[in-house]
Amino acid sequence: MRECISIHVGQAGVQIGNACWELYCLEHGIQPDGQMPSDKTIGGGDDSFNTFFSETGAGKHVPRAVFVDLEPTVVDEVRTGTYRQLFHPEQLITGKEDAANNYARGHYTIGKEIVDLVLDRIRKLADLCTGLQGFLIFHSFGGGTGSGFASLLMERLSVDYGKKSKLEFAIYPAPQVSTAVVEPYNSILTTHTTLEHSDCAFMVDNEAIYDICRRNLDIERPTYTNLNRLIGQIVSSITASLRFDGALNVDLTEFQTNLVPYPRIHFPLATYAPVISAEKAYHEQLSVAEITNACFEPANQMVKCDPRHGKYMACCMLYRGDVVPKDVNAAIATIKTKRTIQFVDWCPTGFKVGINYQPPTVVPGGDLAKVQRAVCMLSNTTAIAEAWARLDHKFDLMYAKRAFVHWYVGEGMEEGEFSEAREDLAALEKDYEEVGVDSVEAEAEEGEEY
């Protein structure tokens, strides 16, 4: 079996975790107490869903997941919520005082007290796996726990499970709305620390998702539940091929092979279609071509940036539901003829396709309509450098005045870490810029220097 362990860190990670596991349970017909009436082989399991759930002798299905937060309130909601019986109490780990939006507290002072306990619990989950494939880590860039503790944990996972892949689902600070003033600091410190430990990081920006909820689902004031359910759908699409049998299946390492041309360029953009409310879906039937085109609309992306200003390096289309390869090929052929979508010249083909016959499931009473087919596109584009540039700019404005730095230094960090992290991100921006340059031009430029 190719099992995956999900690790949900901090408030954002835990709340997205709630949305994801709620959806997985619905998709597989697992009840909130872990029973699965449709599963006939009790205790034994090489069913596809065993990549995400382990089975006990009593026929109970337990998520292969760990929820960690440095303060208890958010995880307490899981402990008392609908799915409280689904998780083993040891999978829900909390500290006593939170990281207070401070990377240094999450990474050094408070994080280090709890990290060994967390690794111990992860080890227990890993021992239940026959062929552990890797880790999915859910966290935000802006919070103290999400930035500091997640990066500490990833460093330690690299030591303990060297070759296992680590994929991140990271909540990127929104351009306009902010939950903390020091988000740029935390984001840049955590990106610098995890850059070498993460194999692939899917970024999600709250504001982009707010806009999708407002525009496509007609929700005037989206709540985090609305956002997380939408993020849950995306995560579900990405992991569907690991949990179901499909026609063209994709596993974790396959994503990296197809999406990551260079180790540092590992931040694909996710786009999901169709995001549509029940009232609208009732009146229209969306074809494969329509949902495929929708993926190339910047409005449907999970991060605010414009791929029309950048170049695509790779593209992964993950379809689910009533989709046949013939339609997909036709849709992609049409897209390739459009001039708005530019690929880098060293990567001519660039489309990888996965098809899963399991139609998308929606949470009953949620905002999303039940549709026959959906697609999630993961694309590695140079446009995401815009997102980094935006963040770096905010970092520079604050750091020029050394604003708020004393909070970090007081927790045992050194100022040098800030400048080191900032230089690393400057290098990352440069990397993206160089990747997008045409290879012929690049050779000509190099020739002049010698």
From Swiss-Prot:
Keywords: Acetylation, Cell projection, Cilium, Cytoplasm, Cytoskeleton, Flagellum, GTP-binding, Hydrolase, Magnesium, Metal-binding, Methylation, Microtubule, Nitration, Nucleotide-binding, Phosphoprotein. A motif (MREC motif) lies at residues 1-4. Its cofactor is Mg(2+). Pfam families: Tubulin, Tubulin_C. InterPro entries: Alpha_tubulin, Tub_FtsZ_C, Tubulin, Tubulin/FtsZ-like_C, Tubulin/FtsZ_2-layer-sand-dom, Tubulin/FtsZ_GTPase_sf, Tubulin_C, Tubulin_CS. The record marks Y450 as: Involved in polymerization. The keyword Endoplasmic reticulum does not apply. The modification 3'-nitrotyrosine is found at Y83, Y450. GTP binds at Q11, E71, S140, G144, T145, T179, N206, N228. Mg(2+) binds at E71. The modification Phosphotyrosine is found at Y432. Alpha-3 and alpha-7 are identical but coded by two different genes, they are testis-specific. Belongs to the tubulin family. Tubulin is the major constituent of microtubules, a cylinder consisting of laterally associated linear protofilaments composed of alpha- and beta-tubulin heterodimers. Microtubules grow by the addition of GTP-tubulin dimers to the microtubule end, where a stabilizing cap forms. Below the cap, tubulin dimers are in GDP-bound state, owing to GTPase activity of alpha-tubulin. Dimer of alpha and beta chains. A typical microtubule is a hollow water-filled tube with an outer diameter of 25 nm and an inner diameter of 15 nM. Alpha-beta heterodimers associate head-to-tail to form protofilaments running lengthwise along the microtubule wall with the beta-tubulin subunit facing the microtubule plus end conferring a structural polarity. Microtubules usually have 13 protofilaments but different protofilament numbers can be found in some organisms and specialized cells. Component of sperm flagellar doublet microtubules. This is Tubulin alpha-3 chain. It comes from Mus musculus.
